[in-house]
Amino acid sequence: MAQEEIQKPTASVPVVKEETPAPVKEVEVPVTTEKAVAAPAPEATEEKVVSEVAVPETEVTAVKEEEVATGKEILQSESFKEEGYLASELQEAEKNALAELKELVREALNKREFTAPPPPPAPVKEEKVEEKKTEETEEKKEEVKTEEKSLEAETKEEEKSAAPATVETKKEEILAAPAPIVAETKKEETPVAPAPVETKPAAPVVAETKKEEILPAAPVTTETKVEEKVVPVETTPAAPVTTETKEEEKAAPVTTETKEEEKAAPGETKKEEKATASTQVKRASKFIKDIFVSVTTSEKKKEEEKPAVVTIEKAFAADQEEETKTVEAVEESIVSITLPETAAYVEPEEVSIWGIPLLEDERSDVILLKFLRARDFKVKEAFTMLKNTVQWRKENKIDDLVSEDLEGSEFEKLVFTHGVDKQGHVVIYSSYGEFQNKEIFSDKEKLSKFLKWRIQFQEKCVRSLDFSPEAKSSFVFVSDFRNAPGLGQRALWQFIKRAVKQFEDNYPEFVAKELFINVPWWYIPYYKTFGSIITSPRTRSKMVLSGPSKSAETIFKYVAPEVVPVKYGGLSKDSPFTVEDGVTEAVVKSTSKYTIDLPATEGSTLSWELRVLGADVSYGAQFEPSNEASYTVIVSKNRKVGLTDEPVITDSFKASEAGKVVITIDNQTFKKKKVLYRSKTQA
């Protein structure tokens, strides 16, 4: 299954071999017959798409055709260089990111965070909760302040309304006091009017008014004191208010003025005996108005002074409430933070991927670097990706899936490994044309069966890698689009897209190079379709597209022709052997040679497969005819078989006459070697 992404075609750049300096390994120069495309270095952020499709001819491309025809272009073309995993090859920022990720992994293992499903950024949620709490407390504070302001306004209004009420009560009291006087005067004046002799009783009437006015004067102040005491009780600060009112009331000479003026009134009545009762009433009303004015002015002063005392104490009370609320909020936050610290100690968790622990192993750094590179060295994103991968493996029981016996022989034509590239990466071939086989992919159940088999295949391939920093820990993928499903088959492409996304998320940075071959000419304009399938920009930068006419040359740039299968233009034939063909075992002693004789009949084709466990031997094969007059034919020259070479040696020979093929294994080491081989003769 392809895990790569596509790059946009760039402008053609002529390549001059004599002037090119030592090539940078990551620069791509795909082979084309009509147009050579030079992709930018991987440092560029733009996506790179190298197209091998035919384009208009130029003089430069004509020269390129001659070079390709002679084979010079393939021999001199530089392959890519994979990013290294050695500590000496890492930049300082990359080393720091790796150290930070290792610390996060260590903390997660100590807290056993890999056991439970990783919540999408958990710390962010806690911060949000704390932010919400602080926002709520702030809102509450604002509400309290607004309530206090409204209460202050209400108290002011109540006090204002209470003040006129007290004034009215005072007015009523004052009115109530002289009211009987007026009534008495009227009663007494009515009989006095016809007879002026009866004016003498006016003096006692005034005296009565004096007494009556003096008597209610005291209760007026006392009643106001009582009422003023009742009013501040609602606003708590009663003491200061009463003292001020007492002082102001003492300062207000209400009773004295009334006494003096009233004393003056009877003097005038004595001097002016001819004055009528109406003049007395007018004077009394005037005195009452003066009293009202003095009372209202004093009450206004009281009102101006009262709110200041009330608001200060209210503000003090509000501050105390805010302090208690903030203390409660702090206590809540302290409780939420201190809970994990009081938790019981738990043993660190042991987590491994592909049989390698996440820490305490030199191979662990290689795995962690893969996740970092997949997320452009963003440590938190890489850590989240790692946790999600571990959880996905647990949910799908990937470790158990490896040893499970799945029936999927029909899928072996769709995805298979064959040889290695020029740098030693295992090559995985995928044939998208097999998706057209309705017997295999006719319904969702069969598609799910294939996906399970494909995951097992990928897992086995990954586990076969050596994750040491100096080894190759990725693959070269060759995706064949011959007879691939058309764009109209959306359901099938959606399945492919989901499968590729699953591999991108859980097998990061296992793609060294992705070659799309036999891409139809009409498919190139829709290369964005590839981009919709493969989402990783880093994977897209490793993709190369080529049409049917240039597929073989594109593969030969990265894989030697003798290793490429015949169906893709190479020289490597498909193995004629099946599972039923038996295997013979032999032991090669140290510092000795071992020969294997395989008989061959005239006109037959003899094929054999051979593997030496531990390698580090020399291999050679020759045909010796039965007729002594005939010459010996060299089938394979003696060559050294190292540990990095292809593990299985496959060869064949067509005999023109009867004879035998002699295979020689030369072991010059001081350790014995085991040889496994099998052969088959075909007419």
From Swiss-Prot:
Q: Does the keyword Coiled coil apply?
A: yes
Cite the InterPro entries for this sequence: CRAL-TRIO_dom, CRAL-TRIO_dom_sf, CRAL/TRIO_N_dom, CRAL/TRIO_N_dom_sf, GOLD_dom, GOLD_dom_sf, PATL, PATL1-6_C_GOLD
Gene Ontology CC: Golgi apparatus; nucleus; plasma membrane
Main localization is: membrane
Glycyl lysine isopeptide (Lys-Gly) (interchain with G-Cter in ubiquitin) crosslink - at what positions? 394
Q: What does this protein do, in the record's words?
A: Carrier protein that may be involved in membrane-trafficking events associated with cell plate formation during cytokinesis. Binds to some hydrophobic molecules such as phosphoinositides and promotes their transfer between the different cellular sites.
- Please identify the protein, giving its name as recorded: Patellin-2
Q: Which gene encodes it?
A: PATL2
